[in-house]
Amino acid sequence: MAEETSLVADKVPEPAVIDAVADAMPDSLEDALRIVLMKARETNGLICGLSEVTRALDRRTAHLCVLADDCEDEEYKKLVTALAKQNNIDLVSMDEREKLAQWAGLTRMAADGSVRKTLKCSCLAVRDFGERTKALDYLLSQLQ
């Protein structure tokens, strides 16, 4: 019995490992945006889809909006741009809808872990950034 208590006392909790990728200084604005979207997705802070994004922009609950340049509908782009400008919400343009969807986690995965199908996402908004990282600081400094 005495040996069991000494073994329990000898166990030291291991320090938490910091995610080096998420806390690394990004090389570009695109890398910073990818990391920020990844962290926001972890905390359930992403809003996808026209209806949800326009509602969040109108209610001023979004902190950041990302709009794809290759969006099919010009009226869609005008609406999101106008709402973001009207409510003083930062708007970031992205080249491809598929890349934006992949960063937002809108992918179908195969059993082996590879990406089977990537959906398309024309617009998303960030309601909660999650934890504060160097990428978030870099992104916010570039937007001002």
UniProtKB/Swiss-Prot annotation:
* Residues spanning the membrane: none
Task: Extract one GO cellular component term from the record.
Answer: ribonucleoprotein complex
Query: Keyword Lipid metabolism, does the record have it?
Result: no
The alphabetized list of GO BP terms reads: post-transcriptional regulation of gene expression; translation
Gene Ontology terms for molecular function: structural constituent of ribosome
Pfam families per the record? Answer: Ribosomal_L7Ae
Q: Which InterPro entries match?
A: Ribosomal_eL30-like_sf, Ribosomal_eL8/eL30/eS12/Gad45, Ribosomal_eS12, Ribosomal_eS12_CS
Q: Which UniProt keywords apply?
A: Ribonucleoprotein, Ribosomal protein
Disulfide pairs?
Answer: none
The family assignment reads: Belongs to the eukaryotic ribosomal protein eS12 family.
What protein am I looking at? Small ribosomal subunit protein eS12
What is the native source organism of this protein?
Answer: Trypanosoma brucei brucei
